[in-house]
UniProtKB/Swiss-Prot annotation:
S-adenosyl-L-methionine binds at residues 60, 69, 93, 115, 144. InterPro entries: Arg_MeTrfase, Methyltransf_25, PRMT_dom, SAM-dependent_MTases_sf. Residues 47-377 form the SAM-dependent MTase PRMT-type domain. Disruption phenotype: Embryonic fibroblasts from mutant mice display growth defects, premature senescence and increased levels of TP53 and multiple TP53 targets. In liver, knockdown disrupts the formation of a cAMP-mediated transcription complex involving CRTC2, reduces the expression of genes encoding gluconeogenic factors and decreases glucose output in primary hepatocytes, it also restores euglycemia in insulin-resistant mice. One of its GO terms (cellular component) is nucleus. Residues 13-22 have a biased composition (Gly residues). This is Protein arginine N-methyltransferase 6. The modification Asymmetric dimethylarginine is found at residue 38. Disulfide bonds: none annotated.
Length: 378
């Protein structure tokens, strides 16, 4: 699941990247009085604000209306009917209950739909409306504190945020796995992969060049605005969530991380940072604006079926996750076969572990190696 960018993940905590990156500089020429620091919220306060965001209908509408997402979960669950028939399932972050109902339709004997936000009340109504209250039990509260009457044969969860790890919900799934999943139990989805590729963002290029076109239309030369537009649109440290097309991608995408949800020690890996190195060669001449990060998750295929992949790639149909864009401070011209290499790490932000932080180190051709530190904003 992923909160709409129009909805705040948290109110009152400061955002932004760490001090080690190439962040945008002050350009107003004057000193500003520093605002008093905002009090840092406790973990329980942050969690409560996070849950409250999921109490509104809009975020659930966005998720269920994402046909790529919802159909992938429906098919991923139904393909595993043989493993679910007559078994018990835990749905972590059940929301309105649709995934729990899919599990019941696949033959599960009992589904525990755990939901920490107030939307659990609506989930209970949805379950009742579909005549499944004897098999789908909606349990209000965080999965970390809810007690089940038994261990389960399978866990299903739609835990993915922007850039895969924004919102840090995977930690809750791993907690549930350790506490409630039987040995050898089924995880839906079972794994996730992260990809990165250099991009030339056609829409951004149009916006940067817009100011040089004003004179042609209105007789006023505003080309001096282009450098200011570049600072505004690129010289920041925000992770930008936006849809790209395959035409925006400058080189072959590189997989830099793979997460097997059954892997022991994955919780510690997430805290330390998930990432890896990459290297690619450009397809042709273009301005390099930055890098795009996306993910895919895989559902086991059952006894005889191929695994099912839910992809958020710009080469696949769009999803509500879009792609996570990391803009450089300014465009860098590249040619065919220009070598681009680097390292990327995803980790929790220090001020709010639910907020994604991305550390990027990169080298373009013969240019010096640079770094930039990004964070997801509210």
């Amino acid at each position: 699941m992923s909160l709409s960018k129009k909805r705040k993940l948290e109110s009152g905590d400061s955002g932004g990247a760490g001090a080690g990156g190439e962040g945008a500089e002050e350009e107003n020429g004057g000193e500003q009085e520093a605002a008093p620091p905002r009090p840092r919220r406790t973990k329980s306060e942050r969690d409560q604000l996070y849950y409250e965001c999921y109490s509104d209908v809009s975020v659930h509408e966005e998720m269920i209306a994402d046909q790529v997402r919802t159909e992938a979960y429906r098919l991923g669950i139904l393909k595993n009917w043989a493993a679910l028939r007559g078994k018990t399932v835990l749905d972590v972050g059940a929301g309105t209950g649709i995934l729990s109902i899919f599990c019941a339709q696949a033959g599960a004997r009992r589904v525990y739909a755990v939901e920490a936000s107030a939307i659990w009340q609506q989930a209970r109504e949805v379950v009742r409306l579909n005549g499944l209250e004897d098999r789908v039990h909606v349990l209000p509260g965080p999965v970390e504190t809810v007690e089940l009457p038994e261990r389960v044969d399978a866990i299903v969860s739609e835990w993915m945020g922007y850039g895969l790890l924004h919102e840090s919900m995977l930690s809750s799934v791993l907690h549930a796995r350790t506490k409630w999943l039987k040995e050898g139990g089924l995880l839906l989805p079972a794994s996730a992969e992260l990809f990165v590729a250099p991009i030339s963002d056609q829409m951004l290029e149009w916006r940067l060049g817009f100011w040089s076109q004003v004179k042609q239309h209105y007789g006023v030369d505003m080309s001096c605005m282009e450098s200011f537009a570049t600072r505004c649109l690129m010289g920041h440290s925000e992770i930008v969530v936006q849809d790209l097309s395959g035409e925006d991608v400058l080189a072959r995408p590189q997989r830099f991380a793979q997460l097997e949800l059954a892997r022991a020690g994955l919780e510690q890996e997430l805290e330390a940072g998930v990432g890896g190195r990459f290297r690619c060669s450009c397809y042709g001449s273009a301005p390099l604006h930055g890098f795009a990060v996306w993910f895919q998750v895989t559902f086991p295929g059952g006894d005889s079926e191929k695994p099912l992949v839910l992809s958020t790639s710009p080469f696949h149909p769009a999803t509500h996750w879009k792609q996570a864009l990391l803009y450089l401070n300014e465009p860098v011209p590249v040619e065919q076969d220009t070598d681009i290499s680097g390292e990327i790490t995803l980790l929790p932000s220090p001020d709010n572990p639910r907020r994604l932080r991305i550390l990027l180190r990169y080298k373009v051709g013969d240019h010096e190696e640079k770094t930039k530190d990004f964070a997801m904003e509210d």
